[in-house]
Structure formats: structure tokens, C-alpha cells
Amino acid sequence: MTKTMCAAVQMASSPNLGANLIEAGRLIEKAAAQGAALVVLPENFALMGMVETDKLEAAETEGSGPIQEFLARTAERLKLWLVGGTLPIRASKGKVHATSLIFDDRGNQVGRYDKIHLFDVNVPGTEEQYRESHTIEAGEHALVLDTPFGRLGVAICYDLRFPELFRQMADTGMDILAVPSAFTAQTGAAHWEILVRARALENLCYAIASNQGGFHVNGRETYGHSMIVDPWGKVMAGLPSGAGIVTAEIDPDRLEKVRAAFPALQHRRMHCR
């Protein structure tokens, strides 16, 4: 594990896939210019459709398609590791997976995570209703993979509310957590920062949380406040709203010192009832 500059990208994606890819490319280039070697895109970075079924029409087969080509080409050209937010990958029964693909600095796909927990809720205090399960097939497996920067875990948006997933990831040796997200304005204001900081500090890891942020053509408003959090739960950098990036340095010495001084993961007593 080496000291590394990382970046979280924040966007307000639209139904226009081409325009979204141009904007994502611009922001990734900005991150690269600031020295970022690891960049995380938000959930639905390539498409925020007018209706949920729009993602079915834009779905790709793993290994081919314009979104995947963009991610691979950008990672290789800028020589950085890229966590590709989410994109719709074809699944069974006419549905898609909400998939995050990870590309190394040579443009090779080195990891895949399919969103496990689907957002089927009525947002309290609003008329907003979401039923991701109508178009998305849930994933089944957590992901933690080796990178030059440490062990990288990936989770997506609503997953943040299920701490057992992250503890499973920590048990395999997670150093950095990437969380592509699209939190609503209402749920974000209530819970976003609390959840991101909690997942980082309770698992003693860095968290790179990239959120959609702003008003969307489909009428939706997302919360923004993309952030990078250290293993003590401190927000190192954040962006309240609008398109942009946040950058911060992941320091393995800082990680080691926090874990050595506060070895909470070693103090678990799961046999107690």
C-alpha cells in the first residue's frame, strides 16, 4: 500500500448518455491533473433516465458497449484506476444489474460489483417512491480487491444502510471503501454524512463517497456532498453541491497508526448473546 491521491467525482447526470460521458471525462481529467491515481464516479453517472425503464434500453453486456469502452479508454489514457460508478449490465428476466466495474491504469477491467441492496422505499415527508427491484436484479457477492493503494472494497448507495456488508468486507482486509451513490436530497440531508463516516470509522478504513448532486432533468434532486473520509471518521474533503471533484491523500501510515492505537476490529466478541 502506497500513499495515493484519490478523487470523488460529483455530477448531476441527465438522460443524455453522450453528454454524461463528456462531463464525466472532463471531471476525471480534472482529477488526474490534480494528481489523482484513483477516481470514483457516482451511481448512474452515465444515465439518469426520465423513467426507471430507460436503463433497460441502455443496458450493456459485460465486456462491450459505449459506457465500458469509455471507462477502459479513460483509465488507460490517464493512467489511473477508475471505479466506474454504476452502469446497467444485462441480467436475467428482462432486468439489469446496477454494476460497478473497476478498471486499472492499463484499462483492464479488474473487478465487478453488483448492487446488493435495492432501494424500494417511499421517502418519508415526500411523495417520492422508488422501486429499483422492478428493473434491477440484486447482486449476491461483496467485492474487495487488491490494488497498488491497498485493498479496495466497493458498495453502492443504499448498501450504506447495511453495516453487516461492510464488516464482511473488513474481515477480508479492506483499506479503502468506494461508494458510488445517488442519495436523494431528503435522505441525504438526514443520513448521508452519518452513514459514510460511520462505515469508515467502524471498519477503520478510508471512504471515497461519490454522490450525484443537483437538479436532474427528470425532476429529481440529489444531495451531493461527495466526500473523502479517513479511518478516524474525519471528513478530509467535501463538495456540497454541483458538478466537480474532491481530492485527498490516502496515507498508509495514518491508516496503520489509527488501527494500532484503536484496534476495535480485534476486540469483537461475537460469541456473546
Question: Which stretches of residues belong to each language-model region?
Answer:
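Short polar catalytic/cofactor-binding loops
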Residues: 10-16
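CN hydrolase (nitrilase-like) catalytic-core segments centered on the catalytic cysteine
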Residues: 62-83, 151, 157-246
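A short C-terminal boundary segment appended to hydrolase-like catalytic domains
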Residues: 253-273
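Short beta-strand scaffold segments in enzyme catalytic cores
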Residues: 84-86, 99-102, 143-145, 226-228, ...
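Cys-nucleophile CN-hydrolase/nitrilase-fold catalytic domain and related Cys-dependent amidase chemistry
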Residues: 17, 25-106, 112, 183-205
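Extreme N-terminal starter segment of soluble prokaryotic enzymes
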Residues: 1-7
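Short, acidic/polar
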Residues: 19-28, 161-167
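Active-site catalytic loop in hydrolytic enzyme cores
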Residues: 60, 91-172, 185-187, 191-194, ...
